Curated annotation (Swiss-Prot):
Belongs to the class-I aminoacyl-tRNA synthetase family. This is Cysteine--tRNA ligase. GO terms for molecular function: ATP binding; cysteine-tRNA ligase activity; zinc ion binding. It catalyses: tRNA(Cys) + L-cysteine + ATP = L-cysteinyl-tRNA(Cys) + AMP + diphosphate. ATP binds at K268. Zn(2+) binds at C28, C208, H233, E237. Keywords: Aminoacyl-tRNA synthetase, ATP-binding, Cytoplasm, Ligase, Metal-binding, Nucleotide-binding, Protein biosynthesis, Zinc. It is found in: Cytoplasm.
Length: 475
């Protein structure tokens, strides 16, 4: 039973979807004014693994990741380079999507842009004003946090303390220092859109509320992002979204930990970041994915050359083990079942159980990865003591690694390269081996191969007149 840590309740909860087998997820996307660094990469790889696991255990996932393509940072970058904000945003959207492809992050179902949803944003703000949660000033429209009594629940901030400690300058138009902008009236030289409250552009927080509701509905399952977005961004999103609909907007809040460099968060503002394109020149994307997987998604992770080299060596070890299993299958194999087979079978069976148990416990990749190396070490030992390994065990071992690869986004270079040619070659080898065993009337072993292939999704069709036929089936 899957359990997820919910930031808003500060507890691990049994995961229950709003709509049967479909999971709707919204992850805050990048403000596209610069290149993607590995701190961003960790967030999107983490949610990619969450998405992959949910799909693996039978859910249908609808994922939305937005692009903030109009913002102060984008405008300032455009002014400095004497180009339009659109030119800046389009450039870095393309870079982001290429970086995600490099990292083997599965594409979102929808990548909405702020500038393509302005009418919906204006309508949303208009309703908040109508319901008394927002007010107009000469500089724009603000959300009045005092009107939303649950403000601060996500980030554990006391609303009364915020209000009592507030000291506004007399010249401020806001009723409270923490009231946040829904709409910013235009300034000279900046892009703007016409609205009932004046020409201008959206504030940062409003965009995610509007786009998530547009594509996922007024209530959905999971909202995520980096831990730094918890306050004020996600707190403000909750306030305006719940005020708008009167409903509980999101069921589970999921936040990823920081990538740290010398004890500080990796960030553009500190200048201590490494871009995806830079690190990809030195390490394969799978090394970076394994580096992330070695820590729980909620925990901070220290980026060092040593940690990257460790991840590189660990990945190579796993590839070597998978290749050794494949080579063993190319040599004569049998159905012998003695204490060596029994011992390894129990390791494999228990490791598989513990892998899923770990992933069901808030996607605990750390404990899940331990089971992968348990299988790796055990099959290495098994192959070293067995002159003729058991074919069914070897098939199950490859199947285990393939499932791990599908969930973690690893082993692409082995299982999925060249349109699965390697897999089909292996299956054909096993089918031919089975034919040979049948011709020698070794039906016990040939039946085990048939059953093992069926578990992998291949159906055997025997014929007395021609070679055995195999075909892929849904399992």
């Amino acid at each position: 039973m899957l359990r997820i840590y919910n930031t808003i309740t500060k507890s691990e909860e049994v995961f229950k979807t709003l709509n049967n087998e479909e999971v709707k997820i919204y992850v805050c996307g990048p403000t596209v004014y610069d290149e993607t660094h590995i701190g961003h990469g960790r967030t999107y790889v983490s949610f990619d693994i969450i998405r992959r696991y949910l799909e693996h255990i039978g859910y249908s996932v609808k994922l939305v990741i937005n692009f903030t393509d109009i913002d102060d940072k984008i405008i300032n970058r455009a002014l400095n380079l004497n180009v339009t904000p659109k030119k800046i945003s389009e450039k870095y959207i393309e870079i982001f999507l290429n970086d995600m492809k490099t990292l083997n992050v599965k594409p979102a179902d929808i990548y909405p842009k702020v500038t393509e949803n302005i009418p919906e944003i204006i309508s949303f703000i208009d309703k908040l004003i109508e319901k008394g949660f927002a007010y107009k000033t000469d500089s724009g429209v603000y959300f009045e946090i005092e009107k939303f009594k649950d403000y601060g629940k996500l980030s554990n901030i006391n609303l009364e303390n915020l209000i009592s400690e507030d000291k506004l300058e007399s010249k401020s138009e806001k009723k409270n220092r923490f009231d946040f902008a829904l709409w910013k009236n235009k300034k000279s030289g900046e892009p703007y859109w016409k609205s009932p409250f004046g020409d201008g552009r959206p504030g940062w927080h409003i965009e995610c509320s509007v786009m998530s509701m547009k594509y996922l509905g007024e209530q959905f399952d999971i909202h995520g992002g980096g831990r730094d977005l918890s306050f004020p961004h996600h707190e403000n999103e909750i306030a305006q979204s719940s005020a708008y609909s009167g409903k509980n907007w999101v069921n589970y809040w999921v936040h990823t930990g920081f990538v740290m460099v010398n004890g500080e968060k990796m960030s553009k503002s500190l200048g201590n970041f490494v871009t995806i394109s830079e690190i990809s020149k030195k390490y394969s994307p799978e090394v970076l994915r394994l580096f992330f997987i070695q820590r729980h998604y909620k925990s901070p992770i220290d980026y060092t050359e040593e940690s990257m080299e460790h991840a590189k060596a660990s990945l190579q070890k796993l590839y070597n083990v998978i290749e050794s299993v494949r080579i063993a299958l190319e040599n004569p194999v049998n159905s012998v079942w003695d204490e060596n087979e029994a011992f390894f079978y129990n390791v494999l069976k228990n490791s598989k159980i513990n892998f899923y148990r770990a992933m069901d416990s808030d996607f605990n990749s750390v404990n899940a990865l331990k089971t992968v190396f348990e299988v790796s070490n055990s099959v290495t030992k098994y192959l070293s003591v067995s002159k003729s390994p058991n074919v069914a065990l070897l098939i199950k071992t490859l199947d285990f690694f393939k499932n791990v690869g599908e969930i973690f986004g690893l082993f692409e270079g082995y299982f999925y390269k060249s349109s699965n040619v390697k897999e089909e070659s292996l299956i054909k080898f096993l089918v031919d081996l089975r034919d040979d065993l049948r011709s020698k009337k070794n039906y016990e072993t040939s039946d085990k191969i048939r059953d093992g292939l069926k578990e992998l999704g291949y159906q055997i069709e025997d014929s007395s007149k021609e070679n055995t036929v195999f075909k892929k089936i849904n399992i």
